[in-house]
A protein has these predicted regions:
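Short beta-strand/loop motif that positions the catalytic acidic residue
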Residues: 253, 259-261
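N-terminal cap/lid segment of alpha/beta-hydrolase-fold proteins
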Residues: 24-54
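Short alpha-helix in the alpha/beta-hydrolase fold that links the catalytic acid
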Residues: 269-279
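Gly/Ser-rich "nucleophile elbow"/oxyanion-hole loop immediately N-terminal to the catalytic nucleophile
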Residues: 48-55, 101-109, 116-142
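Glycine/threonine-rich phosphate-binding loop and adjacent beta-strand/alpha-helix elements that clamp
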Residues: 26-31, 282, 326-516
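Catalytic histidine neighborhood in serine/cysteine hydrolases
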Residues: 280-298
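Short substrate-entry loop that stabilizes the transition state in hydrolases
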Residues: 51-56, 61-88, 93-99, 266-269, ...
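Accessory cap/linker subdomain of secreted extracellular hydrolases
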Residues: 82, 111, 131, 150-252, ...
Length: 516
């Protein structure tokens, strides 16, 4: 991390303790021409100099997949302005009114677009700047989190980032252990394409009419996924290049990083946040992880979502500490996580190392994999998150545990499956179930934190059983009074694809559950 003490001390003195600004900010909407002549439309919000004198540090705030840069000074952008930050939003290539094609936060394309925007900021006298190096932070969720990682890995001018509900490895996000995450994959394709095609066609568009679109590669990948039912090696390689797990091997993220992740997020689950946390920590850079209730899947109505605005306050502290350089700011414990009762907890070790004991659960059974959905889903099927399987489902093994009300589960379960039987293959899904023991009818069962782990198994043979070990999905859960935890292993899912082909699966399962 760069040491710019004189400039940072002066900046801190100018901005610390300011009251919220009351005047409307200045908003500049324009575009730059990126490295390959693609127009990138941006919005630059500047605080009222009567309230906060220039120069200002700047925060780049991206947008989600299929969206466009905010043109409103409300919400957290307004909070940043009142605290003496300029804010820049932009339409990522292929979306909004920007030109080009969407390449899924490719460092060589979208990453270079952001570097061009930083060039623009570096040339402005009203942006805090030392030797052409502006004070830059980045925030935003999902696609806007991915671009923070892709930019900061290659552009040393980024001082701090706050990626929210984003990925470490898109191969795992979209095709966990070889299984297509059907609900999210198809939904993202449709939503993103609508955003790409509709945003820039107006005659009065900032950079002129633009026909946004996906890259040809991405269109082919979607078609192959639908046709094959799994991701081929070329698809996996393409997504690796757009993941910290890929480019970060030689170009690591080594800037102060506050990672925000939703415990019920079934697209980018907490395992990805743990991987990003470990990656940044390995570079010796400051890193913090906050696990909250929500994400791409909303916090369930029977959970307590906790203190409103808690992560926003932590974000502001992170920016003040590492962008403004106010060393007296306390950013708190390296890991904070919320449980379903709304309580925030602090830890000095990684999320996957918090557990103080493990409960081991064993079960054995024979399952049917029909190549189609066999689960009887309770009520309306959720297409993006895990739902319980009926105990009488022939494709499901339900295993009781000794975990009852008042117990706390925190961390990443460990799964070992010994698979025999007969058939070309099967998809196996493992989830923790919360059951109210006061009820005979299992329909109110709920999957703990709405998460399930998936595994693709090929060539099931009765003479050569396979032993497969993999991680479950991380959870942070306090079991309600009168409830008990079960484990289900199923051959079907309401949110992911089933194996295309029938099989009989002889299963011996061992699941280790992390406890406090």
């Amino acid at each position: 991390m760069r040491k710019r003490l004189i400039a940072l001390v002066a900046l801190a003195a100018a901005t610390f303790g300011l009251l919220p600004a009351h005047a409307a900010p200045t908003v500049i909407r324009s575009f730059i021409t990126s490295f390959d002549d693609t127009p990138i439309v941006y919005n630059l919000f500047l605080p009222d100099p009567a309230d906060t004198p220039a120069p200002w540090p700047v925060v780049l705030n991206g947008h989600g997949w299929g969206g466009s840069g905010s043109q409103s000074a409300g919400g957290f952008i307004g909070t940043l302005l009142s605290e003496g930050y300029a804010v820049l939003t932009w339409d990522a290539r292929g979306f909004g009114q920007s030109g080009g094609e969407a390449w899924v936060d490719d460092p060589a394309r979208e990453g270079r677009d952001v570097s061009a925007l930083i060039d623009l900021l570096a040339a402005r006298s009203d942006i805090a700047n030392v030797g052409g190096d502006p004070l830059v932070g980045m925030i935003g969720g999902s696609y806007a989190g991915g671009i923070q990682l892709a930019t900061s890995a290659f552009d040393p001018r980024v001082d701090a980032i706050v990626p929210n509900v984003t990925w470490n490895d898109l191969r795992y996000s979209l095709f966990p252990n070889g299984v297509v995450k059907l609900g999210f994959d198809t939904g993202l394709c449709a939503t993103g394409l609508a955003g790409a095609l509709g945003g820039g066609l107006s005659a009065d568009a900032t950079a002129g009419p633009q026909t946004g679109s996906y890259s040809t590669d991405l269109n082919l990948i979607e078609a192959k996924g639908v046709a094959l039912g799994y991701a081929d090696p070329g698809t996996l390689s393409w997504f690796r290049e757009r993941s910290v797990a890929g480019y970060g091997v030689e170009n690591p993220v080594a800037v102060p990083t506050l990672i925000l992740q939703g415990i019920t997020d079934a697209l980018f689950n907490v395992n990805e946040a743990v991987a990003n946390f470990d990656h940044v920590a390995a570079q010796g850079a400051p890193v913090k992880l906050m696990v909250f209730c929500g994400g791409h899947v909303a916090c369930p109505s029977n959970y307590n979502a906790g203190v409103a605005g808690y992560t926003n306050a932590a974000t502001m502290k992170w920016l003040d500490r590492y962008v403004k350089g106010i060393e007296s700011v306390d950013t708190g414990a390296s890991v904070e996580y919320a449980t379903n009762d709304g309580v925030w907890h602090q830890a000095a070790v990684g999320f996957d190392k918090i557990a103080t004991s493990w409960t081991t659960v064993n079960g054995r059974g024979t399952l049917v994999s029909s190549g189609a959905k066999t689960s009887v889903i309770n009520g309306m099927a959720g297409v993006t998150y895990a739902t319980p399987s009926h105990p009488l489902d022939p494709g499901t093994l339900t295993i009781p545990t000794a975990i009852t009300g008042g117990s706390t589960i925190v961390g990443i379960p460990k799964i070992t499956l010994r698979v025999g039987g007969a058939g070309p293959g099967a998809h196996l899904f493992v989830k923790l179930i919360d059951r109210d023991e006061n009820l005979v009818d299992p329909r109110p069962d709920q999957v703990v934190d709405l998460q399930e782990a998936a595994m693709r198994v090929e060539l099931i043979d009765p003479l050569f059983p396979q032993t497969i070990r993999f991680d479950g999905v991380g959870v942070s859960y306090v079991v309600p009074a009168g409830h008990r935890i079960l484990v289900q292993v199923s051959t079907s899912s309401g949110a992911m694809s089933e194996y295309r082909g029938a099989a009989i699966v002889d299963l011996d399962a061992t699941i280790r559950i992390p406890m406090l």
